[in-house]
Amino acid sequence: MLNIHNIEGKIVKEDDRYIVKDNTSLKNLIVSSTTLFPNKSTSGHKHKGQEEVYMFLTGDGYIYLDEEKLSVQAGDMVLIEDGVFHRVESGARGLYFVCVFDGKRYV
């Protein structure tokens, strides 16, 4: 069992924009958390053959899905389809979000 506000796991990225932790306890899914500092943005990326679920737990900001800009806040969940470019931008309070994706990405 995990606490949604502390998924444990290993820090896989850390810089002046964010801290990203991945929990790889399951064989087929990765649970990843991102603490995105205030007024910062992720680099953005897309995946071929993979969908993702983003759950926003604290703060507010925006998620970009290809050319679409959506406002997000604590309690929002975004379903990201295969091949869609996505990046997250935080507001003045920063953002904490958890995403779940196919663990085979790292195989």
List each language-model region with its residue ranges.
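A short, N-terminal "cap"/entry segment at the start of jelly-roll beta-barrel domains
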Residues: 1-30, 43
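Conserved short histidine dyad/triad with adjacent acidic residue
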Residues: 32-48
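Glycine- and acidic-residue-biased ligand/ion/polar-headgroup-sensing regions
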Residues: 49-51, 56-61
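Short strand-coil-strand connectors
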Residues: 64-68, 91
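Short acidic-glycine-tyrosine-enriched beta hairpin
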Residues: 68-82
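Ligand-binding loop in jelly-roll beta-barrel domains
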Residues: 82-107
